[in-house]
């Protein structure tokens, strides 16, 4: 099993507008200790929106 101090944990990206969790990705905790925010396509909204790391 993965430990809680894993360097590359799986994270879920949720749309800022509709709050749907659309993407699952990995991030490097050493390079990005803060919450990740990326502009990606939201299929629910039908356009590109900011997606933020959700817990």
From Swiss-Prot:
<dbReference type="InterPro" id="IPR011332">
    <property type="entry name" value="Ribosomal_zn-bd"/>
</dbReference>
<dbReference type="Pfam" id="PF00471">
    <property type="entry name" value="Ribosomal_L33"/>
</dbReference>
<dbReference type="GO" id="GO:0005737">
    <property type="term" value="C:cytoplasm"/>
</dbReference>
<dbReference type="GO" id="GO:1990904">
    <property type="term" value="C:ribonucleoprotein complex"/>
</dbReference>
<dbReference type="GO" id="GO:0003735">
    <property type="term" value="F:structural constituent of ribosome"/>
</dbReference>
<dbReference type="InterPro" id="IPR018264">
    <property type="entry name" value="Ribosomal_bL33_CS"/>
</dbReference>
<dbReference type="GO" id="GO:0005840">
    <property type="term" value="C:ribosome"/>
</dbReference>
<dbReference type="InterPro" id="IPR001705">
    <property type="entry name" value="Ribosomal_bL33"/>
</dbReference>
<dbReference type="GO" id="GO:0006412">
    <property type="term" value="P:translation"/>
</dbReference>
<comment type="similarity">
    <text>Belongs to the bacterial ribosomal protein bL33 family.</text>
</comment>
<keyword id="KW-0689">Ribosomal protein</keyword>
<dbReference type="InterPro" id="IPR038584">
    <property type="entry name" value="Ribosomal_bL33_sf"/>
</dbReference>
<protein>
    <recommendedName>
        <fullName>Large ribosomal subunit protein bL33A</fullName>
    </recommendedName>
</protein>
<keyword id="KW-0687">Ribonucleoprotein</keyword>
